[in-house]
């Protein structure tokens, strides 16, 4: 995708919900100042503290810690599984080492903060309701479609991953 996506990389919080996005560093600036302006080291991150009070997650929670699973890895999503309760978990099909990497990434970024769990749970419930109405294949195929701006729907990967489509 060219340019910055219209949503935060890990949290998938869209601009439309009123949260400002900021640049996050995959390798923290404090660990490698040479990567500060390296585009290959940047991703979009939400500004959490203004909207969730003290519930910091994603870039604000990361601080100077390294991420074991980079959001820029081609297979990044394969490290995670989304439970029907909205929680993000390590993919049980991975090796023990890979599960530990996923678990550490979830912990570092606080990807199971209340606001993210609530949002994921909501999209899963909406998807289940649509599946009952339209059928599983129709709904999941629609999630792969981009909007007029070229972006996927917020949290699109949650039901796709939950229903094992990606």
Regions found by a protein language model. Name each.
Residues 1-8:
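Active-site-proximal cofactor/substrate-binding loop regions of enzyme domains
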Residues 55-98, 104-111:
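Long, low-complexity, intrinsically disordered segments enriched in glycines and aromatic residues
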Residues 96-166:
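C-terminal, charged low-complexity interaction regions
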Residues 5, 15, 100-103:
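Intrinsically disordered, low-complexity segments enriched in glycine/proline and serine/threonine
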Residues 9-57, 63:
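Histidine-centered nuclease catalytic patch
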Residues 5, 41-42, 77:
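Short, surface-exposed beta-edge/turn micro-motifs
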